[in-house]
From Swiss-Prot:
HAMAP family, sorted: Ribosomal_uL10
Organism per entry: Geobacillus kaustophilus (strain HTA426)
Name of a matching Pfam family: Ribosomal_L10
Keyword entries, A-Z: Ribonucleoprotein, Ribosomal protein, RNA-binding, rRNA-binding
PANTHER family on file: 39S RIBOSOMAL PROTEIN L10, MITOCHONDRIAL (PTHR11560)
Family in the record: Belongs to the universal ribosomal protein uL10 family.
Protein name (Swiss-Prot/TrEMBL): Large ribosomal subunit protein uL10
Function: Forms part of the ribosomal stalk, playing a central role in the interaction of the ribosome with GTP-bound translation factors.
Length: 166
C-alpha cells in the first residue's frame, strides 16, 4: 500500500480514538474567523484542557462510522473544527458558545456528549449550565444550610438560658 493511504488510516484511527475518549465533542464552522481570532479561541480552549483540531471531512466521516456515530455525517460539510474534551463536559460548549456570541462567524453545528449525538440546541443548553465547580459549590451550600440553621438554633437556646440563669 502507498504511504498516503497508511497515513490516512492513521489519521482516521486517531480521530476515532479521540471520539471514543472524549466526554464532550463540539463541532463548529469556523469560516470567516481570521488568524488572530482563531488563535484567541485556541488559547481559551487550551487553558480549559480542550483539544481543538481541524480534520478533513472525509476522514472524519470514516472515523465516525468506525465509532458508530454516523448520524453526524450531515454536519460535516464545509470547513469544520472539532473541540474534544476528555475531562469537563461543559467546558467546550461554554467556551465556544461565549466566543460565538462575540464572533458571529463561528457557528456551532452539533456534537457528541458522553457518546450520544447532540444537536446545536443541546450544545447551547449545555453551555448555559454552570461548571462542575459551580455545581459542587451549589450542592455544598444546600447541604450546609440545615446544619447552619441547627447550630444557630442551639446557640439561640444557649444564649436564652444564659440570660435566664444570670
Amino acid at each position: 500500500m502507498s504511504s498516503a493511504i497508511e497515513l490516512k488510516k492513521q489519521v482516521v484511527a486517531e480521530i476515532a480514538d479521540k471520539f471514543r475518549a472524549s466526554k464532550a465533542t463540539v463541532i463548529v464552522d469556523y469560516r470567516g474567523l481570521n488568524v488572530a481570532e482563531m488563535t484567541e479561541l485556541r488559547k481559551q480552549l487550551r487553558e480549559a484542557g480542550v483539544e481543538f483540531k481541524v480534520y478533513k471531512n472525509t476522514l472524519t466521516r470514516r472515523a465516525l462510522a468506525e465509532v458508530g456515530l454516523e448520524g453526524l455525517d450531515e454536519v460535516f460539510t464545509g470547513p469544520n473544527a472539532i473541540a474534544f474534551s476528555n475531562e469537563d463536559v461543559v467546558a467546550p460548549a461554554k467556551i465556544l458558545s461565549e466566543f460565538a456570541k462575540t464572533h458571529e462567524a463561528l457557528e456551532i453545528k452539533g456534537g457528541v456528549i458522553e457518546g450520544n449525538i447532540a444537536s446545536k440546541e443541546e450544545i447551547d443548553a449545555l453551555a448555559k449550565l454552570p461548571s462542575r465547580e459551580g455545581l459542587l459549590s451549589m450542592l455544598l451550600s444546600v447541604l450546609q444550610a440545615p446544619i447552619r440553621n441547627f447550630a444557630l438554633a442551639i446557640k439561640a437556646v444557649a444564649d436564652k438560658q444564659e440570660e435566664q440563669g444570670a
